[in-house]
Amino acid sequence: MGNCLKPLKEQPPSASPKPLTIPSSSVEPVKENLKEFRFAELNKATKRFRKYMVIKGNDNGFTRTFYEGCINETTFAPSRTGITVSVMECYQDNSQTLQDWKEEVKSLGRISHPNLVKLLGYCCEENKSFLVFEYLHKGSLNRYIFGKEEEALPWETRVKIAIGAAQSIAFLHWVKNSALYRELRMYNILLDEHYNTKLFYLGSKKLCLLEESVTTAFIGRTVYIPPEYVISGHLGTKSDVYTFGVILLEILTGLKASDGKKNENMQSLHVWTKPFLSDQSKIREIIDPRLGNDYPVNAATQMGKLIKRCIKLDTRKRPSMQQVFDGLNDIAEIKD
């Protein structure tokens, strides 16, 4: 995109994460301050919608398409130099009115947190709908945990990323009370140039048809399905804790939860690793080998214990996301 490489202005990452006792956030009655883009503006900003990234869900077959654009930092007008943005194409339900869709977008725009990808604006014109987000230069976390071409993330960076993700989810639970975050997956955990975490959050299934029902959101990714959903069809905030526990396990081991059955007993990742998670003498056997010995064993063991709590079958025995956030902050302080 030429010289358009300047990120949105951000505060430098603090030396140590702040507790989430009072959410560093904003929700109503804060104004959404979203720009309503014209189709011609996005067409120019993205150089005629030059496709740059397609995310395909292996679980329910959706395709999510993003375009890279460049806009002026102050006016948000198309520009050769300025800030880079991500433009996501949406697919609306035909039964939904344009006004209803805009209200959903504005509602999302009123939710603000440093660990959520920022919504900048929207466009609904020419029978097409788009959402415009800030651009995250490091991309998705799964690229660094599972990607062969990237260097292994150091232990401290992994913990920092996990803390940011936990903080964003705890905040969403605080805002929505009992809302479910259906898009909690590794590829929705995005990173800026300083490896600060930004969770990609759409807020409502009404914004995009790819945000389908709870059932279709889980089809095919059984490794992330909390047991209470299988038993009763119930999902809640503690279901998010379970899913996040599986993601933490992937961060710890460098293995995909869906690849867990490659072990000799054909067990899923969270099943066969359980005996190793809280045993300091065994934890080395499941740690991402790319870390070598460059990590604090006590901290890794505490991470394993936290994961075991997150993936307990009984929802009442799982921690809240606030407690997960606190636990990860404690782990970050362990240096041996």
Swiss-Prot record:
Disruption phenotype: No visible phenotype. Slight hydration defects of wild-type pollen placed on the stigma. Slight hydration defects of wild-type pollen placed on the stigma of plants lacking both BKN1 and BKN2, but normal pollen grain adhesion and pollen tube growth. Partial suppression of the pleiotropic phenotypes conferred by the dominant mutation zed1-D (e.g. high-temperature-dependent growth retardation and autoimmunity). GO terms for molecular function: ATP binding; protein serine/threonine kinase activity. PROSITE patterns: PROTEIN_KINASE_DOM. This is Inactive serine/threonine-protein kinase BKN2. Together with SZE1 and ZED1, required for effector-triggered immunity (e.g. Pseudomonas syringae type III effector HopZ1a) via the activation of ZAR1, thus being essential for resistance against P. syringae pv. tomato DC3000 expressing HopZ1a. Collaboratively with BKN1, involved in compatible pollen-stigma interactions. GO terms for cellular component: nucleus; plasma membrane. It is a lipid-anchor. Signal peptide: none annotated. A lipid is attached at G2 (N-myristoyl glycine). Gene3D superfamilies: Phosphorylase Kinase, domain 1, Transferase(Phosphotransferase) domain 1. Expressed in stigma and ovaries in flowers, and in stems and seedlings. Residues 52-332 form the Protein kinase domain. The keyword Secreted does not apply. Changing C4A: Disrupted plasma membrane localization.
